[in-house]
């Protein structure tokens, strides 16, 4: 599913909302999650999961094509940990 499909589904389930309004709401939710992560904060959606950022320290890597050793810089990466309700639903428990 892509963002536009999500917007269409939400709009169809809520006929009192215009699709443009749903697009704005979904965009605002994603923007706020992104902003919180950029500030180093954790975003928890109970039952669904938690978004956070983790640090990947600098390390030596290898170019798979040439075998040459390269330095990989330190970086921050997004991380998602599923909530119990989501895990249970995916594994058949309801």
From Swiss-Prot:
CDD domains named among the record's database cross-references: IHF_B
Which superkingdom, per the lineage?
Answer: Bacteria
| Keywords assigned | DNA recombination, DNA-binding, Transcription, Transcription regulation, Translation regulation
Q: Which GO terms describe its biological process?
A: DNA recombination; regulation of DNA-templated transcription; regulation of translation
Q: What GO MF annotations does this protein's record show?
A: DNA binding; structural constituent of chromatin
SUPFAM superfamilies in alphabetical order: IHF-like DNA-binding proteins
The record's listing under PROSITE patterns reads:
HISTONE_LIKE
**What are the record's GO terms for cellular component?**
chromosome; cytosol
Summary of subunit composition and partner proteins: Heterodimer of an alpha and a beta chain.
Protein role: This protein is one of the two subunits of integration host factor, a specific DNA-binding protein that functions in genetic recombination as well as in transcriptional and translational control.
Family matches, as NCBIfam families = hip, PRK00199.1
Q: Which family does it belong to?
A: Belongs to the bacterial histone-like protein family.
Q: What is this protein called?
A: Integration host factor subunit beta
Q: Which organism is it from?
A: Brucella abortus (strain 2308)
Query: Its encoding gene is what?
Result: ihfB
């Amino acid at each position: 599913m892509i963002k536009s499909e999500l917007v269409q589904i939400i709009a169809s389930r809520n006929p009192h909302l215009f699709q443009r309004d749903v697009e704005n709401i979904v965009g605002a939710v994603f923007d706020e999650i992104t902003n919180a992560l950029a500030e180093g904060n954790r975003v928890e959606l109970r039952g669904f999961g938690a978004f956070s950022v983790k640090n990947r320290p600098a390390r030596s890597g290898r170019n798979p094509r040439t075998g040459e050793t390269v330095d990989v810089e330190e970086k921050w990466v997004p991380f998602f940990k599923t909530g119990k309700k989501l895990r249970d639903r995916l594994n058949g428990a309801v």
